[in-house]
A protein has these predicted regions:
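Sec/SRP-type N-terminal targeting helices
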Residues: 54-58, 62, 71-72, 104-130, ...
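C-terminal structured "cap/appendage" subdomains that terminate the fold
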Residues: 419-453, 459
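Bacterial Sec-pathway N-terminal export signals of envelope proteins
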Residues: 32-94, 139-154, 158-160, 168, ...
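Intrinsic disorder/low-complexity segments
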Residues: 1-33
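Gram-negative outer-membrane assembly/targeting C-terminal domains
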Residues: 457-479
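Small/polar, glycine/serine/threonine/aspartate-rich low-complexity segments that form flexible
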Residues: 34, 81-141, 273-286, 317-318, ...
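Periplasmic alpha-helical coiled-coil/stalk elements that build and connect Gram-negative outer-membrane
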Residues: 167-292, 398, 402, 425, ...
C-alpha cells in the first residue's frame, strides 16, 4: 500500500517543479539587463544567416557556371590523328595535329597545324606531304545561315541573360523572407504583450482574494463570493497558460529567422528580450500611393523577370529565323610544304558548300513556338503591371484600415478602463456585486488585447506594403 505522506510530498514536489518551470517563462529574469530584440536585428539575421535566403543566393553561382559552360563552345580545340595502311599496294602513314579556334563573330572558325606523311603514297593522295611535312592554315565562314547568330552564340547570350535573371529570383525571395520575418516578429511581440495582460488580470484576482477572505471572516460577504473569486483565479490561470503557449509558439517560429551569428543556430527569444511597447505607428501618407505604384513597377522583380525571359525567347526567335536560311559556307586553306621538291611546296584551296533542308519543319516549328511564348509573356507583362498596382493599393488600404482600427481600439481601452474604475468604486460602496466588476475587468482585458492585435495588424500591413513596393530591396539586386 502506498504511503499517503510520501505520496503527498511527491505531489507537492511535482507541483513545485512545475511552478518553477512555469515561472521561468512567465517571470522575466532581472539579474542582468537584456537588450530588447528589435526588428532590424531580426532582418539582419535573415540576410546573413537564414538558410533559404543563402540557398537563393547560390542561384547566381549556378547562373555564372552556366555562362562559363556556354563559353566552352568557343574553347580552343586540339585535334590530332593519323592513319596507316597495314595491307595493300601502298604502305604510307600519315599524321596531323591542328588547333581550331571558333570565332565569337559571324559563326566562323580559324585553324592551323602541321601534318606529315611517310612511306609510299600516290601523288594524288592529298595526305601526301614532303619528308619534313607541311604547315596548315585556314578558315571557314558561313555566308547566310549561322552568320548573324548560331547555336553557340545563342546559348552564350541566353546564359548571360540567366545571370541577370538570377537577380529577380533572389529579390523575390528576399522580399518574401523579409515580409515573413516582419510578420513573425510582430506576432511574437503581440503574444508577449498578451501574456503580460493575462498575468495582470490574474494578479488582480489574486490580490482581491485575500480581501474577500477577510470580508467573509467578518461576515461582510457570503462564502460563495470567495468561492466565485477562486474560480475566477483558476480560469485566469488557464488563460495565462494558453497565452504562454501562444508566446512560446511565436518565439519558436521567430527563431527560424533570428539566428546566432556565431553558429547560425536558431535563437528562441525569451521574454526578457521583449520591447516595452510597439514602435510608433504614423498615419500613412495618402500622397505617396501614386509614387509608390510607379516605384513598384520599376523595382518589383516580376516585371524584370518577364522582360528578361522575353529577351531569351527573342534569341530563340532569331535562331529559328536563322535556321530557315540555307547553309552557304566558304573556306580557304593554305598548305606550306618543307623539304622534298617532288611536290608543290605551297598549295591554296578554296571551298564552298551549300546545304538546306527542303521542308525546314524544325526551324518553322521553333519559330512558331518562340513567337507564341513571346505573345503569352507580353500578356503576362501587362497583367503583372496591373497586379503590382493592385497589390500596392490593397496593401495601402489594409494599412489605412489598421491605423483607423488602432485609434478605435485605443478609445475602447480608455472607455473600458473608465467603466472598470467606476464599477470598482461602486463595489467599495456596496452598490454592486463582484460579478459586475469581473465583467468590467474582462471587458478591459478584451479591449487591451484588441488594441495589441490592432497594433500587430498595423505592422503586418506595413510589412506587406513594404513588400508590395519593394521598399526593402537591396541596391545590389536592383537594375
Amino acid at each position: 500500500m502506498r504511503n499517503p505522506v510520501i505520496s503527498s510530498q511527491s505531489s507537492l514536489l511535482s507541483r513545485f517543479a512545475a511552478l518553477c518551470l512555469f515561472s521561468s517563462f512567465v517571470i522575466p529574469h532581472s539579474s542582468f539587463a537584456v537588450k530588447p530584440l528589435l526588428l532590424p536585428e531580426v532582418l539582419a539575421s535573415v540576410q546573413n544567416q537564414y538558410p533559404p535566403y543563402l540557398a537563393a543566393l547560390i542561384e547566381q553561382d549556378i547562373a555564372n557556371g552556366r555562362a562559363r559552360q556556354a563559353l566552352g563552345a568557343f574553347d580552343l580545340n586540339l585535334n590530332a590523328g593519323g592513319s596507316f595502311n597495314p595491307a595493300g599496294y601502298y604502305d604510307g602513314q600519315t599524321g596531323y595535329a591542328t588547333l581550331e579556334q571558333p570565332l565569337p563573330f559571324w559563326g566562323g572558325n580559324v585553324y592551323g597545324g602541321y601534318r606529315m606523311s611517310s612511306g609510299f603514297l600516290p601523288n594524288y593522295n592529298k595526305d601526301r606531304t614532303g619528308v619534313d611535312g607541311e604547315a596548315i592554315l585556314g578558315f571557314r565562314i558561313p555566308l547566310l545561315r549561322d552568320g548573324t547568330i548560331d547555336r553557340r552564340r545563342a546559348s552564350l547570350f541566353q546564359a548571360r541573360l540567366d545571370q541577370k535573371l538570377a537577380d529577380p529570383f533572389i529579390l523575390r525571395q528576399h522580399l518574401d523572407f523579409i515580409r515573413a520575418a516582419t510578420i513573425g516578429y510582430y506576432g511574437w511581440l503581440a503574444a508577449g504583450q498578451r501574456l503580460g495582460l493575462s498575468e495582470e488580470l490574474l494578479r488582480i484576482a489574486k490580490d482581491r482574494d485575500s480581501a474577500i477572505a477577510e470580508q467573509v471572516k467578518r461576515g461582510a460577504s457570503a462564502p460563495i463570493v470567495q468561492v466565485d473569486n477562486k474560480r475566477l483565479v483558476v480560469s485566469r490561470q488557464i488563460a495565462v497558460v494558453q497565452a504562454l503557449r501562444r508566446f512560446q509558439a511565436t518565439a519558436i517560429e521567430l527563431s527560424l529567422f533570428h539566428r546566432s551569428s556565431a553558429d547560425d543556430q536558431p535563437i528562441v527569444s525569451e521574454r526578457g528580450r521583449l520591447p516595452g511597447a510597439f514602435p510608433a505607428h504614423p498615419e500613412p501618407d495618402a500622397n505617396q500611393i501614386v509614387a509608390d505604384i510607379a516605384k513598384a513597377a520599376i523595382f518589383r522583380p516580376e516585371l524584370r523577370r518577364i522582360e528578361l525571359t522575353i529577351e531569351k525567347l527573342r534569341i530563340d526567335q532569331r535562331l529559328a529565323k536563322n535556321n530557315l536560311l540555307p547553309n552557304i559556307d566558304i573556306g580557304v586553306q593554305a598548305n606550306q610544304g618543307n623539304g622534298s621538291k617532288d611536290i608543290e611546296p605551297t598549295e591554296i584551296e578554296a571551298k564552298i558548300e551549300f546545304k538546306m533542308p527542303l521542308q525546314r519543319r524544325e526551324a518553322k516549328g521553333r519559330l512558331e513556338t518562340a513567337e507564341a511564348q513571346i505573345e503569352r509573356l507580353e500578356n503576362d507583362r501587362k497583367f503583372a503591371r496591373d497586379r503590382i498596382a493592385a497589390d500596392v493599393r490593397d496593401a495601402y488600404s489594409a494599412m489605412i484600415a489598421a491605423h483607423d482600427q488602432l485609434k478605435q481600439t485605443q478609445l475602447n481601452v480608455d472607455l473600458s478602463r473608465q467603466l472598470e474604475r467606476a464599477e470598482s468604486e461602486r463595489l467599495k460602496q456596496g452598490a454592486t456585486d463582484l460579478l459586475a466588476l469581473q465583467i468590467r475587468e474582462q471587458a478591459t482585458f478584451d479591449a487591451k488585447v484588441l488594441h495589441v492585435e490592432a497594433q500587430a495588424e498595423y505592422f503586418r500591413a506595413q510589412g506587406n506594403y513594404r513588400a508590395a513596393t519593394a521598399a526593402d530591396a537591396p541596391a545590389s539586386l536592383l537594375r
